[in-house]
Each structure stands twice: as structure tokens, then as C-alpha cells.
């Protein structure tokens, strides 16, 4: 599987944020810590495929709030880029996936549920 680096995530964030929004990282948050959670899950066999990996990027970035602005958009975009890097092309309703990312940020949807939804969408 292909992974996103911290530089990749920052670059994706810079592409999705509007110029009138507050740029940069949130001072008390760590992108490295969010990415370490993903590496940890991989080490312990909790990420079995690209869908699990993409869902972890989306959920952990949405909850982590590592940027001053555009965390949910960055989370979605990282999920989408992760899928694409790993040769998974999904067509989904942006309102539906947007709602799921918002719910992930609120702690209502977790990476397991999002991964299951991604697998379901792959079968459509």
C-alpha cells in the first residue's frame, strides 16, 4: 500500500484551503502524532487494505484538527488521494461523504464504519 507523508498532507491542505482562511498548523496539535496513529494501527495489523487506510486518514485527520482551518476538507481530500494512489477509483455523492467526514470529526462515525462504507461504494 502507498501512504501519505506529512509533506503530502500539508500540500493537500494547502490546495483545499481558501486564501481568506487562517493558514497553517494549529499550535497545540501534531500532524506527526496523527500519522503515528495510522502507522501504529498498521504495525498491529489493524489496517488490512486500502479502504482501512483511507478511512484512517479521513477520521484521524478530521478528529485531530491539526490545521487552523479546513481540517474536514483536508481529511476528505487525503482519503480520496490515498484511494487514488492505491488504484481505487470510487464515485460517490459528495454530500454523503461530506456528511460522513463531519460525523467522523464529531466522533459519531469511526474509521471502521467509514472503511465499511468505502468498501460498499466500491461494489456499486
What are these regions (language model features)?
Residues 1-124:
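FIC/Doc superfamily catalytic core
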